Amino acid sequence: VILMDQQGRVPTKTKPHRDVNQAIKHLKLEAEALSRAHGNLDETFEDACEMILKCQGRVVVTGMGKAGLIGGKISATFASTGTSSLFLHPGEALHGDLGRVRQEDVVLALSKSGATPEVVRLVPAARSIGASVLAICSPSQTPLGEEADIVLELGEAPEACPLGLAPTVSTTLMLAIGDALAMAVLEGRNFTREEFAAFH
């Protein structure tokens, strides 16, 4: 396929390797954010793992927009590695689907800002049922952080988007922290290859 401009001409690159250089810049931003995330891990992460290991119900993951898409993957990772989990859309939760949440569940709420309205409204409703709440957001002094039992902070997450708007670095951090949680819990359960195979 040959793309042409409005005058029917094949455009030429005036800035060789510009796209590659931009991609490298964006990857560096994400890699740097992941490196900084190491410094945010402390006993709070251990508390989060313990909360999930002691959970007698399911890990109910929730998030809006791109954070919700990341939440779906985190939930799937938990489910395939020995921790019963489901994803709950926060908008639907406030229109009846909150009935999926049980007292013995842990709600894992994702929001970069910690102020996503749908997620913030869901958390106290889940707490009123008796569920525990674990949040991944930044910073902890936010409406979501103040409602949660445990907060895992994203830390500094400047987006790779040139406009500073599209979730990029923040969603990478959410996914990495979610994966780290799932893998730590997997080890805590002594989850085996045979058990993993049974789910596949």
Feature-to-residue mapping (PLM):
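An N-terminal, well-structured beta->alpha segment
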Residues: D5, R9-T12, P16-G57
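Glycine-rich phosphate-binding loops that contact phosphosugars or nucleotide phosphates
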Residues: G57-A176, A180-L186
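Short, Lys/Arg-enriched N-terminal segments with co-localized hydrophobic residues
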Residues: V1-L3
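Long, charged amphipathic helices and adjacent flexible linkers at domain junctions
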Residues: T192-H200
